[in-house]
């Protein structure tokens, strides 16, 4: 398997940093990186140009753990140009934690001044590619580190789609050189809800541009699989982890955004990702501390 260089070590294992589980995260001895929601870091970047980093997150950074700010509000796929103050906040987050890269989503979250409150899929059209290309360029102008963008989970497709998701993402990285955050749980959710083979869908994606991968849980409801980030990892997502990691070494991280389980269950999920990727566990110290 060919090794490749990237912003993060290719065999790193990480987790989404959340204040509710920061104690467990602090005990992970082999933690390669963590991702923090950029909008959760307070700061008045319009005045001071600075953000406040929580003490627990700063302690991880001081230990040498890479921290990646992950934005959710830029609306890169929105028709309006990205707001300068939002880009400045993302850049300030990167500076505050000495980030090796930052990330956002292939999505829009507002239109006509209205906030959707969640990530919405971009129509896979040439026009949308032009919009994304322009907004990515505007964003990167303010950044001193690479930008990666994430594939999102969607429950519908736009009727005027001109590309498959793999074709769309491939064209986007070809045009812009942007990196990808490959969300393996979203690959599974989108394939399952459309009656497609997730392994076949995974193999069509531009793997050589992946900066790191998300792994998360979900559940079945109303005949649909929902990528919730609040449920245990399904075996099917771990199977995608195993398949991708075997041929494309890339950093992997657990995403959990609520309904946090007991520490032992969280450690089990991290161990499951490590085992699927045939990597050493990062939970040895945490388990010893809690024994």
Regions found by a protein language model. Give the residues of each.
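Active-site beta-loop-alpha junctions enriched in small/polar residues
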Residues: 16-20, 37-41, 72-75, 106-107, ...
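Boundary/entry segment of secreted carbohydrate-active catalytic domains
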Residues: 2-27
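Acidic (Asp/Glu)-rich catalytic clusters
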Residues: 24-30, 48-69, 85-100, 137-142, ...
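Catalytic domains of carbohydrate-active enzymes, especially glycoside hydrolases
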Residues: 19-43, 96-97
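Gly/Pro-rich active-site loop or hairpin
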Residues: 45-50, 119-129, 190-249
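Conserved, mostly hydrophobic/aromatic
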Residues: 34, 102, 147, 183, ...
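Active-site acidic/histidine proton-transfer and metal-coordination neighborhood
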Residues: 83-180
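Distinct, well-ordered alpha-helical segments
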Residues: 24-27, 83, 158-174, 190-204, ...
